[in-house]
Amino acid sequence: MNQFKIHSPYKPTGDQPRAIKSISEGILKGEKFQTLLGVTGSGKTFTMANIIEKVQKPTLVLAHNKTLAAQLTSEFREFFPENCVEYFVSYYDYYQPEAYVPQTDTFIEKDASINDEIDKLRHSATSALFERNDVIVVASVSCIYGLGNPEEYKKLTVSLREGMEKDRDEIMRQLVDIQYERNEINFVRGTFRARGDVLDIFPASSTNIGIRVEFFGDEIDKIREFDVLTGNIISARKHALIFPASHFATSKDKLEIAIKKIEEELEDRVKVLTAEDKLLEAQRVRQRTNFDIEMMREVGYCSGIENYSRVLDGRAPGTPPKTLMDYFPDDFLLFIDESHVTLPQVKAMYGGDRSRKNNLVEYGFRLPCAYDNRPLKFDEFEGKLNQTVFVSATPAQYELEHSTNVAEQIIRPTGLLDPEIIVKPIKGQIDDLYASIKETIDKGFRVLVTTLTKKMSEDLTDYLKSMGIKTEYLHSSIDTIKRMEIIRDLRKGKFDVLVGINLLREGLDIPEVALVAILDADKEGFLRSETSLVQTIGRAARNSESKVIMYADNITKAMDKAISETNRRRKIQMEYNDKHGIVPRTVLKDIRDVIQTKVAEDEAEYKVNNNTDKLSKKEIEKLINKYEEEMKVAAKELQFERAAELRDEILKLKEQL
C-alpha cells in the first residue's frame, strides 16, 4: 500500500501546526464538515498537503476554475513527487452546446474542439483511482457532470498477464469493444497495431509510453513498456491493465438492451408529440434518434452518446448521473478550495443546463432521457460527500453553518501582516492615485487598481499610459492563457500597473504588488461586498511594505466589516510577531512559465442577446428577469465583469419598455 509522503524543505509554522492537528483529528474522528479559514498567503495548500499526509485518504480537491486547478496540481506535485497527483477539468478548448431558439426557429448544432492532452489527463485520473490508493485529483466543477458508470468502466478493462493463454485476435476484438481503433500508420492514444506475433497498444491515459505484447502461439510471452516515438524498450512488466478509450464505453450486451429501451422511449415520445399535433417535432425526433441508433449498432457509439447515458447505465428517470466522485472509494476526502466561490458555482450548474434542454426536448431534437445527461443538483452533490474541508479566507454562511470545526490560519509563515488600509475621499482620487502609483513604482513595486466599470478601466488605463506609466488592462474577454501571461509580465516588470474590474479570479497573489487601490469603494453592490473587499485586500498580503487605499466618501457596512476583520487579523499577527521576534519578509516566489496545455477559458466573455429590437414587450420583460437571475448568480460567483455586462444590458432593455 503506497503512503502519501511530503517532500518539502519547509516545516509547518505559524498557525499551520494547529490547523493541521485540528482538522486531521476531526477527519480521523469522522467529522463530516470542517472549515480551514486561512488568510491569503498563510500557506493553505501546504496545510492541505500535511492533512492528506496525516489522514492517508484518496483526495479530491475542487477548484472553481481551470487555472487555479492547474496551479494547485503543480503545487501538490511538488509536495508529493512519489504519489499520484492528477488534473481533471473539462476537455473542451471550445464548446458550443446544442440548443434551439424557437423565436427564430434556429437549431445550433453542438460544436466542440477537444483538447487531446486534457482528455489524456482525465483518463489518467480515472485509471489511477482503480490502480492505486495514494491519489490526489485536482478538479474543476466539471467533475459534477456525468462521466459514465465506473463499474462498467472497470468491468471493460482488458487484463493482460505474462503466461496467460489468450488469442491475439480475441484481444484485438476486446480492444475494439472498448473504443480502441486499429491503426497501423498513425499510432496515437487510443489505438493499437498488430505485426505478426507482436501487438502494440497506446493506452488512452498515456503520453508517450505504449504497451508491447509479444505472443508465442496463443500464449502471452512478454509484456513490455516502450517509447512510442523511438521504439526503445523502457521496462518489462508482468501485468498490464488497459482501460477503455472512452468513459462512455459499454459492453455489446448492455448496448443492445439500451438500444431497445431507446426505441421504446422513442415510440412513447412520438405518440405524445403526435397527440399534441406536433407532427414536425415527431418526425424530427424519430429521424434523429434512428440515426443515432444506427451509429451505435455499427460502431458502438454516436455523436452526443452522453445524451443516452441514463439508458446506457440502466438508471431510472431523474436519478443522478455517475460522476468523477463515484470513481473514488467511499472513504475519500474532499477539499473545496475557495469554497465561497466554488459552492455557488456547483449550485448554479443544474439550472442552466435544464433550461437549455427544455427546448431541445420540447421541439423534438432530443428524447426526454437527455434531461438526465446533466450536472448534479446541489442536494445530490451533498449526498455524495464523505468528509469535506471547506478552504477559504472568507467562508460563506453555508460553510460556517455546516462545519463542526473551524480552524483559523491567520499567522503567515513569513510573518507578513494583513495590509494597512487607508480611506481617502473620492474627490481628486485620480490625481491622488497617480501620486501613490509613482511613489510605489519608484520603490520597485507593482500596483493593482480595481474599478467599477469596463469604461472606467479603459479610461484609467489610457490616462495612466498618457502619463508615462506602463499599464495593462485585464478584462473578461482575455482567455486564460493570455491572462496568465499578463500576470507573469507584471511580475517580471514589463509593466507596473494592472487595472481591472475583477482582480480576484486568478487568485492574483503577486509578491511584487505593494499597493492595491479600490476606486469608488463606497458604491454598495456585488462589486464592493464584504467578501469582495476582503478578497481584494488580500491581493496586497504578499509584500511587507504593502498597503490598500480605498477611495470613498462614506464608510459602508461592507467596508466597515472588511476593515474591522482586516484590523482584527493584523492585530493577532503583530502580537504573534512581537512575541516570537519575527520580522515580516516579502515572499520570494518563482515566476513559473505559463501552463503548456492550452485550456479553454472558464469564464468566457458572456454573450448577451444584442438583437432585441424585434422582441415584444412581454419577451423583453422575460429577458430582463432571466438576465437579473444570471446577474445574481454571476455576482455570487465573484464573476463581476460578467455581472456588470448583464447589469448594463438590463438597463438598455428597460429603456426599450
UniProtKB/Swiss-Prot annotation:
One of its GO terms (cellular component) is excinuclease repair complex. PROSITE patterns: HELICASE_ATP_BIND_1 (PS51192), HELICASE_CTER (PS51194), UVR (PS50151). Keywords: ATP-binding, Cytoplasm, DNA damage, DNA excision, DNA repair, Excision nuclease, Helicase, Hydrolase, Nucleotide-binding, SOS response. Residues 621-656 form the UVR domain. The keyword tRNA processing does not apply. ATP binds at residues 38-45. GO terms for biological process: nucleotide-excision repair; SOS response. It holds the Pfam family UvrB. A motif (Beta-hairpin) lies at residues 91-114. The UvrABC repair system catalyzes the recognition and processing of DNA lesions. A damage recognition complex composed of 2 UvrA and 2 UvrB subunits scans DNA for abnormalities. Upon binding of the UvrA(2)B(2) complex to a putative damaged site, the DNA wraps around one UvrB monomer. DNA wrap is dependent on ATP binding by UvrB and probably causes local melting of the DNA helix, facilitating insertion of UvrB beta-hairpin between the DNA strands. Then UvrB probes one DNA strand for the presence of a lesion. Forms a heterotetramer with UvrA during the search for lesions. Interacts with UvrC in an incision complex. PANTHER family: UVRABC SYSTEM PROTEIN B. This is UvrABC system protein B. It comes from Clostridium novyi (strain NT).
